[in-house]
From Swiss-Prot:
Its EC number is 2.7.4.9. One of its GO terms (cellular component) is cytoplasm. The keyword Cell division does not apply. SUPFAM superfamilies: P-loop containing nucleoside triphosphate hydrolases. The gene is tmk. This is Probable thymidylate kinase. PROSITE patterns: THYMIDYLATE_KINASE. Keywords: ATP-binding, Kinase, Nucleotide biosynthesis, Nucleotide-binding, Transferase. Transmembrane segments: none annotated.
Length: 205
């Protein structure tokens, strides 16, 4: 089974991914907990570029284009799918990913790139069984991440986050595997809502 958690920053994706992994492990499943960007060379490059707001460009410190950024994310994802996701699924493991190609669609679409081009660029990606979109108002997102020492370009601009949230909700209408979860609820309530959907998927109602 392949499960993805999505949402704007501060929505609680990492927390819920860990809780979900523990739930599966307690039931005897072998779980692979992963994330995007990954820890591959591509992922490390992306993290460096994002954390510096694109100021550490590849050539002479010049900021890379949004198209180049999208291609880097796709390259990292291709390695992720080929080296970890596919082999793990073929081995019968449960794969839980904190972000996946839906993040690229939401963020890079918000940056002005063509959605169809982004979808085509990520067509190679293995489709998850279910995607939990942890939906959170942007003001609450900014409040939650304010205490973090985050320099990510994604987190700097309120307007970008607003567009990204709108895009996620539009994507949820396009991709039936995406299920919207109210991330304003407390951690336990959100977890229980996720588990209820997982049990339905597993036929354990």
């Amino acid at each position: 089974m392949f499960i993805v958690l999505e949402g704007i920053d501060g929505a609680g994706k990492s927390t819920q991914a860990k809780l979900l992994a523990e739930w599966f492990e307690n039931r005897g499943y072998e779980v692979v907990l992963t994330k995007e960007p990954t820890d591959t060379p591509f992922g490390k490059l992306i993290r460096r570029l994002v954390l510096t707001g694109g100021k550490e460009g590849i050539i002479d410190g010049a900021k890379i284009s949004h198209e180049a950024e999208a291609l880097l994310f796709a390259a990292d994802r291709a390695e992720h799918v080929d080296k970890l996701i596919k082999p793990s699924l073929e081995a019968g493991k449960v794969v839980i990913s904190d972000r996946y190609f839906y993040s690229s669609l939401a963020y890079q679409w918000a940056r002005g790139l063509d959605l169809e081009w982004l979808i085509d660029l990520n067509r190679f990606a293995v489709k998850p069984d279910i995607v939990f979109l942890l939906d959170l108002p942007v003001k609450e997102s900014m409040n939650r991440i304010r205490s973090r020492k985050v320099k990510s370009e994604f987190d700097k601009i309120f307007e970008l986050q607003r567009k990204v949230r709108e895009n996620y909700l539009k994507l949820a209408e396009m991709f039936p595997e995406m299920k919207i979860i109210n991330a304003m609820e407390d951690v336990e309530t959100v977890h229980n809502q996720i588990i209820a959907l997982i049990e339905t998927l597993l036929g354990e109602e």
